[in-house]
Amino acid sequence: MTNPMQATRKIISITDQNVVHREDQVAREYPLTIYVNDREFATMVCTQADLEEMVIGFLGSEGLIRFYKQDVASLSIDESRGFAYVSLTKELPTEWQFYSKRMIGSCCGKSRQSFYFHNDAKTAKTSMSRTTMTPEQCFRLMEALQEQSVIFQQTGGVHNAALATPEQMLISRTDIGRHNALDKLYGYCLMNGVPVRDKVLLFSGRISSEVLLKAAKIGVGIMLSKSAPTELALTMAEELNITTAGFIRDGRMNIYTVPERILTPKKEVQ
């Protein structure tokens, strides 16, 4: 049976001493075109898994869905043709065709100017989370994410994201697209009524501005990554009151924004 998430390819592996012909695993790409109320809305190139969650999470992050049961009349996916059909209980906003357009807007009414999609100022949430955690909990959660990253270990070609409490990881999702992995998590939360304000977001890739915005739209207050952030992402995190920590590996980490949610040791070295 064909694995929809990865494929086997014959490759030539070269080192400084050897040339080896062998088989290797590579991640598959799957295009999915989303229709909303019979109108073509977006095409996403993704990993063919958890597609319903991804569609719902994407529409939620675009501001079209707030409550799954109230806002979605029907959802069906034709995986053989690569189409998703969503019927909403309300009409599309008149400005829906501009949702994918880049524009410059201010964050939550502040004067600082940052790059946002058309509707980001309305859908990005300023975090009011009171969740706190220790560095040791951060290390354990990131180790758990790594252990769950089976497809990445086999292919090296996907991103992993997870939702957790400070004590344990709750759910993880995988995709070739970093945004898609986050949309899958958000979709799961919307479809299952999972509260997110007290949760922690774990991520395998860098924290870019668009990734940070996804976290804000999901509604978490803490985002942990094994990789680096960008300067614009940190500016947004400060404005949205989101704690960001990166380079979490080998018992080390960097805290970039809103550090009071990470309970650091009292002894500090200047």
UniProtKB/Swiss-Prot annotation:
Its main location: cytoplasm. One of its GO terms (cellular component) is cytoplasm. The keyword Lyase does not apply. Keywords: Cytoplasm, Molybdenum cofactor biosynthesis. SUPFAM superfamilies: Cytidine deaminase-like. It is found in: Cytoplasm. The active site is at 108 (cysteine persulfide intermediate). The keyword Nucleotidyltransferase does not apply. One of its GO terms (molecular function) is sulfur carrier activity. One of its GO terms (biological process) is Mo-molybdopterin cofactor biosynthetic process. Mo-bis(molybdopterin guanine dinucleotide) binds at residues 247-252. Pfam families: FdhD-NarQ (PF02634). InterPro entries: Cytidine_deaminase-like, FdhD. It comes from the Bacteria. Required for formate dehydrogenase (FDH) activity. Acts as a sulfur carrier protein that transfers sulfur from IscS to the molybdenum cofactor prior to its insertion into FDH. HAMAP family: FdhD (MF_00187). Belongs to the FdhD family. This is Sulfur carrier protein FdhD. It comes from Halalkalibacterium halodurans (strain ATCC BAA-125 / DSM 18197 / FERM 7344 / JCM 9153 / C-125) (Bacillus halodurans).
